[in-house]
From Swiss-Prot:
Alphabetized InterPro entries for the sequence: Amidase, Amidase_CS, Amidase_dom, AS_sf, GatA
Taxonomic source organism: Teredinibacter turnerae (strain ATCC 39867 / T7901)
Binding partners and assembly: Heterotrimer of A, B and C subunits.
PROSITE patterns assigned: AMIDASES
Family: Belongs to the amidase family. GatA subfamily.
Protein name: Glutamyl-tRNA(Gln) amidotransferase subunit A
Reactions performed catalytically: L-glutamyl-tRNA(Gln) + L-glutamine + ATP + H2O = L-glutaminyl-tRNA(Gln) + L-glutamate + ADP + phosphate + H(+)
Swiss-Prot/TrEMBL keywords: ATP-binding, Ligase, Nucleotide-binding, Protein biosynthesis
Amino acid sequence: MHNLTIAEISRKLQAKEFSSEEITRYFLDRIKQQDPTYNCYVTVTEELAMAQAKAADARLAAGNAPTMCGVPFAHKDIFCTNGVKTTCGSKMLDNFVPPYNATVVENYINEGAVMLGKTNMDEFAMGSSNETSYFGPVKNPWDTNCVPGGSSGGSAAAVAARMAPGATATDTGGSIRQPAALCGITGIKPTYGRVSRWGMIAFASSLDQAGVMARSAEDAAIMLNVMAGYDNKDSTCIDEPVPDYIANLGDSLAGVTIGVPKEYFEVGLNPGTEARVQDAIKQYETAGAKIKSISLPHSHLAVPAYYVIAPAECSANLSRFDGVRYGHRCDDPKDLMDLYKRSRGEGFGEEVKRRILVGTYCLSAGYYDAYYGKSQQVRRLIKQDFVDAFKEVDVIMGPTAPSPAFAFGSKGDDPVAMYLEDIYTIATNLAGLPGMSVPCGLVDNKPVGLQLIGNFFAESKLLNLAHQFQLATDFHTLAPSSLA
């Protein structure tokens, strides 16, 4: 049963082939069996899941239940869940139990979907390897000596290890697409403002966006149908009609023009990764798409611009964690300043502290214009590169990550090497565009991801292109050989 997709589970639930309680119990038992190996979950919500499954079965019996009613899935532990611990992968929030649900969580509750638990992640979503989590690293199901990617490593590994058929995730600079690539699953980051951020713990507010991880584009479309839409509680959420993402999956590739940026195939790209990605692009050409070489001339500035803007916003957002209102509080503070210093010093991990320091420096008097102001100017140039490109092409394709999954500890002493893991994904966040990663083969028995980048609100087009690729290939069906 663990190999069933969301679409298959939904059809079987509607056909009464099994109940939501049965499939939910199956996945809960599988988590108990598998998760000690992979460490994907911070919290497993067994009692809540069974209660939600029972309620879903009642809706299914009554008829006309929504597509995801009764389907089990997981939430990244960055979304507030009423009455369920929400840690954001940090000691700072080790015992934080929100009194409300994030809009994304509420949308799934209204759909009747069943939450299996909350998945592990890099602390406050800062990382590309899931090594910064207070709750320990997540192991990649394809090779347990390697990282799953980050920050949504728990969600990616849970889907890859068949401990959930799908999971929510977030993406600030690649945190959906990079772990999706490294774990051999499908992940989509929607357009900025397409999905509500209300109740999603903030890292960098102008870059953060919620999205989904699943095994196929069809499943991702089903999940995005539930999540997407306007929310007046989020001032950055855009009131734009949401199409039915499932309805457009059958569109032909004929007449589609794919742009391939030359900057994405230069120094630093693993040769095996490049070969798999080029093979995938050729597959599209065979299916009737036109391939066009393009240039995104400011691509080399994306990483440095991001690592000024994101830490600056993180510095401001994380200032609310002061030991006074919620989160970790130090023991026996001498005075208010001691409370602030020790609570934050004890509550935050090393990578989070590093980014707060960088961000605070960039925002300080005398440096603001030179760093933050200049980076925002670069951001506009990067966005304009995409605007110009989409005048000539329908979609942009290239690698998701520069290499397959790397070994634990191999980049821990070199923050810049770790930051370069997101070299192909960051520009999409800076521009606010939708991006997607789909499995396109293996290198040394580890997955490689093909990245698709669309114009604003082109999620339907990306999902359709990914679905057509998955109809013609079986890379998305491959499972790690170690799985029971």
